[in-house]
């Protein structure tokens, strides 16, 4: 990736992706070498770093939520620490299904590509990187938005914008 020139702020999306990656390192048990490598030194800007990791490791998916341990569940896009803990606890009392996962806080919009319940996927979808990215990003909507807002520029708000000094 090209670094911004001295004195110019980094692009907001790049900054946001770095914050997300930092979160993965601190709270999700990822190592820096897992997220980026010499072969893949940049994040995919279309998806968050956790989803980017999952898409590069499709051989480890889908994960059966009925048997996967906490550390494995944490690596599934759409499942955070609270949801992973709830899944592990709920398995003691019975079998899990997709509606119960949703109630536990799992973001099925992202997670359903990477998990199974009772050996079945939520929808019959191919486990292919390009297919999943297209579904997650809704490329048509992004291109439409970019076309409609081509002449606009956006910047991060500061406290001064709210009258706070």
Where on the chain are the PLM-derived regions?
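C-terminal extensions
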Residues: 42-72, 98-165
């Amino acid at each position: 990736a090209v670094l911004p020139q001295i004195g110019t702020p980094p692009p907001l999306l790049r900054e946001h992706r770095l914050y997300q990656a930092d979160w993965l390192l601190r709270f999700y048990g990822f190592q820096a070498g897992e997220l980026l490598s010499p072969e893949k030194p940049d994040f995919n800007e279309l998806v968050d770093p956790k989803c980017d990791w999952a898409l590069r490791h499709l051989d480890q998916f889908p994960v059966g939520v009925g048997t996967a341990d906490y550390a494995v569940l944490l690596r599934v896009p759409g499942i955070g620490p609270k949801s992973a803990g709830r899944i592990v606890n709920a398995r003691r009392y019975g079998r899990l299904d997709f509606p119960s996962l949703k109630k536990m806080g799992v973001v099925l919009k992202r997670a359903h590509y990477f998990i199974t319940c009772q050996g079945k996927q939520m929808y019959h979808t191919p486990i292919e990187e390009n297919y999943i990215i297209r579904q997650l990003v809704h490329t048509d909507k992004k291109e439409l938005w970019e076309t409609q807002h081509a002449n606009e520029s956006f910047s991060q708000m500061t406290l001064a914008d709210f009258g706070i000094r």
